[in-house]
């Protein structure tokens, strides 16, 4: 774009002939169009989806993703008002958070609770903010939704979890929650794509046959040998009667 503006605004430096001037202009124009095409390709969804595995494969990329997520959360907390709508063009008014009273119990309180639960790991965890969040969420004296455990669960659900993350080099504190979610939501993938190897699983579970026998087997599931209930008793052979 800078080259295109330079070609439009700056005087022609090559005054030898009109042909050289037009070739310089066409070269700048083609360079500007190629740079715009590259930017359009770089921000397309297919380009980002193609390189998403590379982005989440290294620790630097994971920290960069966390930085992007926190900056987006900070931008959302600045640009979204506590009532759920956008601020006026003059900018947000610098005022203290007002506690919601009984007169303000309107349907917009649910919107404010959902927008505040998105910013659950913000650094402003003062008691007044926590009390206003718990009151506006409508749960009364229960635990407010602005807790760091909700943030961990949200991050685990929306972020991909390749097999490299489950190794001992990268430990997640609440990996048990992720195992429970994947076992309940996608049980047909449990054992092939997600989760640790079979030796570290709890005893008495219904494991996948492909974990032990390979993916191409007729039997779909296999009961573990340490199931809490007894198996079918063997019928006696006729020669032993």
UniProtKB/Swiss-Prot annotation:
Region (Disordered): 86-153
Pfam families according to UniProt: Deltaretro_Tax
A single GO cellular-component term on record: host cell nucleolus
Coiled coil: none
Keyword set, alphabetical order: Apoptosis, Host membrane, Host mitochondrion, Host mitochondrion inner membrane, Host nucleus, Membrane, Repressor, Transcription, Transcription regulation
Motif annotated as Nuclear localization signal 1, chain positions: 73-78
Chain positions of motif Mitochondrial targeting signal: 175-184
Further remark: HTLV-1 lineages are divided in four clades, A (Cosmopolitan), B (Central African group), C (Melanesian group) and D (New Central African group).
Family of the protein in this entry: Belongs to the HTLV-1 accessory protein p30II family.
Function comment: p30II is a multifunctional regulator that sequesters EP300/CREBBP and down-regulates CREB-responsive element (CRE) and Tax-responsive element (TRE) mediated transcription. Specifically binds and represses tax/rex mRNA nuclear export. Since Tax and Rex are positive regulators of viral gene expression, their inhibition by p30II reduces virion production, and allows the virus to escape the host immune surveillance and persist latently in an immune-competent host. p13II increases mitochondrial permeability to monovalent cations, producing a rapid, membrane potential-dependent influx of potassium. This could involve a channel-forming activity. Interferes with cell proliferation and transformation and promotes apoptosis induced by ceramide and Fas ligand, probably using the Ras signaling.
Subunit structure: p30II binds to the KIX domains of CREBBP and EP300.
Protein name (record): Accessory protein p30II
Organism: Human T-cell leukemia virus 1 (isolate Caribbea HS-35 subtype A)
């Amino acid at each position: 774009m800078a080259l295109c503006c330079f070609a439009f605004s700056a005087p022609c430096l090559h005054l030898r002939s009109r042909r050289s001037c037009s070739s310089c202009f066409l070269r700048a124009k083609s360079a500007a169009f190629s740079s715009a095409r590259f930017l359009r390709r770089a921000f397309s969804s297919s380009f980002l989806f193609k390189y998403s595995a590379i982005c989440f494969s290294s620790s630097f990329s994971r920290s960069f993703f966390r930085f992007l997520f926190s900056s987006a959360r900070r931008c959302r907390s600045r640009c979204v008002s506590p009532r759920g709508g956008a601020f006026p063009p003059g900018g947000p008014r610098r005022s203290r958070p007002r506690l919601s009273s009984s007169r303000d119990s309107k349907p917009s309180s649910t919107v404010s609770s959902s927008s505040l639960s998105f910013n659950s790991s913000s650094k402003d965890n003062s008691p007044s903010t926590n009390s206003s969040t718990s009151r506006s969420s409508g749960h009364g004296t229960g635990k407010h939704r602005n807790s760091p455990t909700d943030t961990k669960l949200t991050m685990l659900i929306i972020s991909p979890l390749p097999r490299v993350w489950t190794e001992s080099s990268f430990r997640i504190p609440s990996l048990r929650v992720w195992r429970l979610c994947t076992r309940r939501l996608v049980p047909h993938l449990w054992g092939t794509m997600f989760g640790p190897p079979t030796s570290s699983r709890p005893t008495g579970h219904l494991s996948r046959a492909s974990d032990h026998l390979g993916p191409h087997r007729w039997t779909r599931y296999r009961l573990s040998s340490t199931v809490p209930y007894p198996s079918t008793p063997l019928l006696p052979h006729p020669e032993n009667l």
